[in-house]
């Protein structure tokens, strides 16, 4: 795809580096397919006349799942007596062409390899200059600013912090990201000097994108770990029209592992439906939702040392965001993208305290809810 207009590029060459002549060329819709790729990690190089060569490093290839990629190419416009083209890797260059400085692309493959990262883009960003992370949560302080002033965006729309148990132990941070690496594509992170399209942020910006599903083959993934169960599925809705779906559901297993009710319980669901058309552009329906529950209990009276030891309660967080996005190519150099979305967040905390005579007294009940309807449109 052209990185600025998102127009498909025909006859671009895509090859697997260091594997002989294994490669392919794109068709009129910019699609390509490479079979018989060796299992492991590979580097993919894409080139076309008039465009800078693009290289994606360390792409994991397994025997159980196809790799679906969207590769943007930057147009190379120069008037020179001699043209020498050399491939160049720029991980510090964001996907947004309007970002001159202060931005960096976050690869979900990088997030998966980051030590103690939990596949979390926020924890990955703590490795960048000017960003300080926290050991217990994914809160990040960017250039000394509070984590609560960090903005999260999904598919171009500002959303509530998509983190499980956000703001429970500290403002701006949480336990685990609800954005699974199974569905999130390459995204942008800004630690300053935001492009003019961004606002309402004093610290940093995470501009996340949900990738399109595989429009040729059905694929399903099941993962089981200490933190939870992860189910993912993607595939074509119509192979003829190129439409696809992708979804991911996670359910916590922490309470099952320990057998008590004091543990954190969470669920999250994210999805995207993509419907390209011949003349009306591309329509996408996307959404994300998460449910968090925490129920602490008072400890034995003989072990009381602080007020918190004698308190019990129930904390609930509910968040959701979803929308409809339309992208239309006006000509070879211009496209318009419009989105209509809604966001919702609700939290409630109830606290009870055990008295000296073993009576449970209600001491607090905090409720907060917020919803927004957002419409944006821009011409590029």
Language-model segments: residues:
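Periplasmic N-terminal accessory/gating domains of Gram-negative outer-membrane beta-barrel systems
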Residues: 52, 58-63, 68, 84-194, ...
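Short sequence motifs at beta-strands and strand-loop junctions characteristic
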Residues: 133-134, 198, 223-225, 261-265, ...
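Short strand-turn segments of transmembrane beta-barrel domains in outer membranes
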Residues: 173-177, 185-195, 204-235, 245-264
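Outer-membrane beta-barrel translocator domains and adjoining extracellular loop/strand segments
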Residues: 257-262, 290, 295-304, 325, ...
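Transmembrane beta-barrel wall of Gram-negative outer-membrane proteins
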Residues: 225-251, 261-293, 313-342
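Periplasm-facing N-terminal accessory domains of Gram-negative outer-membrane beta-barrel systems
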Residues: 1-84, 88-90
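Membrane-embedded beta-strand positions in outer-membrane beta-barrel channels/transporters
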Residues: 31, 68, 139, 186, ...
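Extracellular loop and loop/strand-boundary signature of outer-membrane beta-barrel proteins
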Residues: 217-219, 257-261, 305-312, 321-325, ...
């Amino acid at each position: 795809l052209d990185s600025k207009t998102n127009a498909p590029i025909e006859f671009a060459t895509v090859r697997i580096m260091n594997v002989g002549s294994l490669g392919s060329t794109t068709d009129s819709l910019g699609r390509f397919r490479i079979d018989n790729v060796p299992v492991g990690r590979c580097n993919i190089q894409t080139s076309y006349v008039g465009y800078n060569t693009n290289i994606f490093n360390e792409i994991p290839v397994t025997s159980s799942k196809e790799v679906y990629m969207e590769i943007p190419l930057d147009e190379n416009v120069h008037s020179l007596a001699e043209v020498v083209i050399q491939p160049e890797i720029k991980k510090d260059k964001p996907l947004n062409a309007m970002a001159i400085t202060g931005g960096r692309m976050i690869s979900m493959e990088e997030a998966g390899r980051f030590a103690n990262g939990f596949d979390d883009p926020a924890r990955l960003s703590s490795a960048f200059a000017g960003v300080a992370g926290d050991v217990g949560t994914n809160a990040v302080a960017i250039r000394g600013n509070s984590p609560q002033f960090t903005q999260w965006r999904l598919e171009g729309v500002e959303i509530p912090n998509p983190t499980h148990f956000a703001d429970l132990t500290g403002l701006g941070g949480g336990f685990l990201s609800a954005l699974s690496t199974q569905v999130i594509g390459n995204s942008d992170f800004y630690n300053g000097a935001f492009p003019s399209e961004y606002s309402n942020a004093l610290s940093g910006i995470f501009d996340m994108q949900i990738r399109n599903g595989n429009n040729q083959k059905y694929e399903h993934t099941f993962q089981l770990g200490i933190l939870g169960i992860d189910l993912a599925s993607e595939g074509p809705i119509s192979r003829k029209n190129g439409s696809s779906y992708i979804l991911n559901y996670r359910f916590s297993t922490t309470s099952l592992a320990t057998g008590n009710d004091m543990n954190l319980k969470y669920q999250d669901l994210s999805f995207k439906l993509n419907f390209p058309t011949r003349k009306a552009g591309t329509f996408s329906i996307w959404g994300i939702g998460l449910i968090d529950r925490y129920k602490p209990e008072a400890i034995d009276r003989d072990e009381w040392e602080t007020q918190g030891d004698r308190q019990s309660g129930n904390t609930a967080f509910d968040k959701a965001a979803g929308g409809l996005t339309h992208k239309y190519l006006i000509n070879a150099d211009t496209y318009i993208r419009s989105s209509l979305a809604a966001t919702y967040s609700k939290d409630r905390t109830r606290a009870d305290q055990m008295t000296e005579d073993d009576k449970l007294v209600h001491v607090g009940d905090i409720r907060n809810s917020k919803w927004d309807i957002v419409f944006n449109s821009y011409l590029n």
